[in-house]
């Protein structure tokens, strides 16, 4: 039986903290502010509160405000000049190439964003599967239901 390796995306395969997350957070604040008709400051506090409580801002927005997750992700993660924002980890391609077995991305990020990051980082073809927030029906990790679905889908024991 081959070993299965599970990788997160943001801040694992690339540095999202320094350039991408600040931009995504700003876009989330703007979207939440507009959608709920609240100040940017209140939107920022709500975004962080949902992140702390649910592991993903989107989960709180769906639960408490019936937000459309597809619209929200499109508005907050469709970044222009993306190439300049992505900083892959040093020796990423070489390191991943040394890992033998099935490799799967498991991320709370949206599909289009994830695929773009992997392609810009030149490691897209190195992964056998990509499991994104859409695949988990917008239930973020580390939620047990999301993990159970992920493990079953890829027959991981």
Regions found by a protein language model. Give the residues of each.
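A general structural motif
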Residues: 1-2, 100, 157
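N-terminal helical cap/lid subdomain that shapes the substrate entry/recognition surface
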Residues: 2-7, 12-90, 112
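Small/polar loops that bind or transfer phosphate-bearing groups
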Residues: 16, 105-106
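Short, structured coil segments at secondary-structure junctions
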Residues: 65, 99, 123-126
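Substrate-recognition "cap/lid" segment bordering the active-site pocket of phosphatases
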Residues: 84, 104, 110-157
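Catalytic-core regions built around general acid/base machinery
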Residues: 91-100
């Amino acid at each position: 039986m081959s070993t299965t390796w599970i990788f997160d995306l943001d801040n694992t395969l690339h540095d999202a903290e320094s350039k991408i997350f600040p931009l995504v957070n700003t876009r989330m604040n703007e979207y939440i502010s507009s959608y709920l008709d609240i100040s940017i400051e209140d939107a920022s506090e709500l975004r962080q509160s949902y992140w702390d409580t649910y592991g993903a801002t989107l989960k709180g927005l769906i639960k408490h405000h019936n937000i459309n997750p597809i619209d929200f992700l499109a508005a907050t993660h469709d970044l222009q000049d993306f190439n300049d924002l992505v900083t892959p980890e040093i020796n990423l391609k070489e390191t991943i190439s040394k890992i033998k077995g099935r490799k799967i991305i498991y991320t709370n990020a949206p599909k289009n964003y994830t695929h773009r990051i992997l392609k810009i980082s030149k490691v897209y073809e190195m992964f056998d599967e990509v499991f994104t927030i859409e695949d988990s029906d917008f239930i973020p990790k580390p939620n047990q239901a999301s993990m159970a679905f992920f493990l079953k889908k890829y027959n991981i024991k």
